[in-house]
Amino acid sequence: MVVTIFAKIALMGQWVKYKAPFICRNTKKVSKSRWRWLSLRSNSKYMATVGFSERIYLQYLRTKFKTISKLAPATAGRMAFDLFCTPYPKYKKRKAPAIFHHAKKRTVVLSDQTKIHGFEWLPNKPNNETVLIAHGYASYAYKFEHYITPLLKMGYRVLAFDGPAHGQSEGKHIHVVVYQEAIQKIMEQAGPVHHFIGHSLGALTLSMIAENIGQAESRKFVLIAPATKTTTTFANFFKMMHLNEVTITAFLNDVSSKTHHKVEFFAADRALANYKGPLLWVHDEKDMVCPYEDIIDFKRNAPSNIKFLITNGLGHNKVYKTADVMDQIMAFLTPSK
């Protein structure tokens, strides 16, 4: 009986996972932009915008965790964390923007032999410094195409890699520790790196890098819409998945086991509390993925070396694509003469 139930759940999950994008193929908005596992990680306001296929899959997942938690709560917790760390399926090959055809392809290898693929651009008039771009969850390096040329014009060598389990890179899961190792390997194998730009999960990971990399006054960080408090992200995920307390406890234990830290450790405000180098923090007041409310206390008491650029109405994913925001980021990164 139990085996039959699990078999049906597994089959249903596979059907929805692979068929849902095609169910939605006649609805351009849904098939192109809304079929994203990111919706499973955000808050209830965002859920109001998701499509029919996502709601089917979400209900399947809720039923799955509820059933498994009754028999093996530790397993349910591990499976929930695995889901949290798994980007949505790569069912569509993306066309490379023109600027990427002029890049040199680079590959770095992680400790588990996972290959991380990226791109390198060299300026005509080098200033002998490098900028590394770290994209967010369920994103990829292509989305920062408009950053490349302005950085090259300022003389920077530019690196942009697809994170683990994203874009052209290998891997099945990503979380801060995995992403942090990837960035450290990029610095070792493709460095040196002098300045950093990161969005969302990439920005949170860069806050951890900033905490550990040293306090060089010449090194600049740009953090765009960082996941300020992982506890908020997890709480939204628990609520959305209808996880019970036993499963939540198992989930948090699995996080601690795999990362060697409690979830509270993974917070941009904690990591940057004593950081002394120049840093630009960009955030939108209407961000529904990484809430602006999470940064208010830190912003009020932040050290003077951290500058804030606060926008209104751009949300989480448009904030780094807007011309005015990009101009201010480039002004911040302009080399001193």
PLM feature segments, named:
Residues H173-H194:
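Alpha/beta-hydrolase active-site loop
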Residues Y275, W281-H283, D287:
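Short beta-strand/loop motif that positions the catalytic acidic residue
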Residues L314-A323:
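Catalytic histidine-centered segment of alpha/beta-hydrolase-like enzymes
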Residues M288-D294:
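Conserved alpha/beta-hydrolase "acid-adjacent" motif
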Residues W35, N43-S44, G51-V108:
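An N-terminal hydrophobic leader/cap segment in hydrolases
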Residues I213-H261:
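Hydrolase active-site cap/lid region
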Residues I148-E170:
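Conserved alpha/beta-hydrolase
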Residues Y137-I148:
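The serine-hydrolase catalytic nucleophile loop
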